[in-house]
Amino acid sequence: MHVADFSFNLPKNLIARYPLPERSTCRLLSLDGHSGAIKHNVFTDILDQLSLGDLLVFNNTRVIPARLFGRKISGGKVEVLVERVLDNQRVLAHIRASKTPKIDTLLLLGDNENIRAIIVARHQIWFELLFDDQRDILTILNDAGHIPLPYYLDRPDYSLDRELYQTVYSQHPGAIAAPTAGLHFDQQLLSALRVKGVEMVFITLHVGTGTFQPIKVKKIEHHHMYSEYTEVPHTVVDAVIACKSRGNRVVAVGTTSVRSLESAIVSVSNSKHTMLAPFCGETSIFIYPGYRFRVIDALITNFHLPQSTPIMLVSAFAGYQHTFNAYREAVNLAYRFLSYGDAMFITNNNSVF
C-alpha cells in the first residue's frame, strides 16, 4: 500500500489544543471491526463496553520534561529534545538549529543558559550529549526542561501540562510523548472498572521517535521504525494467558500497548505455533494492513494524524475501509483529534494467540 492511501482531510479546528476539564468526559466512537458498525458514546460508557474478566493493558511510561532551549557557545539558538537517557550525564537527543551543530560544540541550555552540554558524537538522527553538571539528567530536566508537547498543538507548554500530559497511572520516566489513549482514564473510572471486575496490567514502552516519525517513503512496506524500549513483564504474560483461557478479551489501551504485546510473541521451537513470553528490550515493530494480530481482541485509541504509523495500525486491526469510514464520520461530527482529543473503542476478536 502507498502512504497516500492513508490521507484524509483533517480541519485544523478539530485538533484539540487543550484537554477537557475532566479526563473521562470526552466523546467515544465505538467501531465494530467486523461489520463496520459505528456507535457514538461518551468515554465513561467504556464501562458498558467491558465485561467481568476482560483485561485492560496499559502503558505506564511517564513523559519527561525533555525539551531544553538555549544556544551554541557561538551564539546560534538551539532546541534540544532528549530522547534517551544513557546514564547520569549522557543522553541521545534531537537538536534543532539554523545550522547542524558539529561534534565538540558546547551548548548553553536552560532559561538561564547555565546548563553546559557538549556534543560528543552523532548516531543516525540523534546527537550524543555529555552534560557538565553535578546533577543527574532527570534532575536537570525536571528543574529546567519543558514538556515536549506535539508540534501540532501549536502552543508553548504550560505548568499544568506537566500533570495533564501524563496518565494518572504513569510510573516509569522515559517517554517524550504520552501514550494518549490512557489520558482519558481518571481514578474514579479506574475504580469503577475494578469494581466491575475488569482486570488491569501494565507494560512499559517509552514513546519516542519511532511512534511519531514521519514516513518519507511512498510504499509503507519500505518504512523502517526507529526502535523504542519496552518491557512486557511475566505478570502481563500470565494475565493474558489466564484471560484467554477463560474466554475473555484482551483490550489494549493505546497503540503502544499493542506494539509491546505483539513484540513479545515468540516462535515455538520446531513448530509453526507462537507464544507470548516476557520481553525486555528494543522494539521496532511496524504494524500495517495485512498484519496478523496475535494477542489483542479490542483497542482503545485516539484519532490520529493522516499518513501516520498509528492510523496504519488501526487500519490493520479494524480494516482499512472501516477505519476510514469511521474517520470521515468523526470529521463530519466534529470529533476532537490527536493527543488531547476524543477516543475510539474498536472490537475485532481476530487474535490467534
UniProtKB/Swiss-Prot annotation:
PANTHER family: S-ADENOSYLMETHIONINE:TRNA RIBOSYLTRANSFERASE-ISOMERASE. The keyword S-adenosyl-L-methionine applies. Disulfide bonds: none annotated. It comes from Baumannia cicadellinicola subsp. Homalodisca coagulata. The lineage of its organism: Bacteria, Pseudomonadati, Pseudomonadota, Gammaproteobacteria, Candidatus Palibaumannia. GO terms for molecular function: S-adenosylmethionine:tRNA ribosyltransferase-isomerase activity. SUPFAM superfamilies: QueA-like (SSF111337). This is S-adenosylmethionine:tRNA ribosyltransferase-isomerase. Its main location: cytoplasm. It is found in: Cytoplasm.
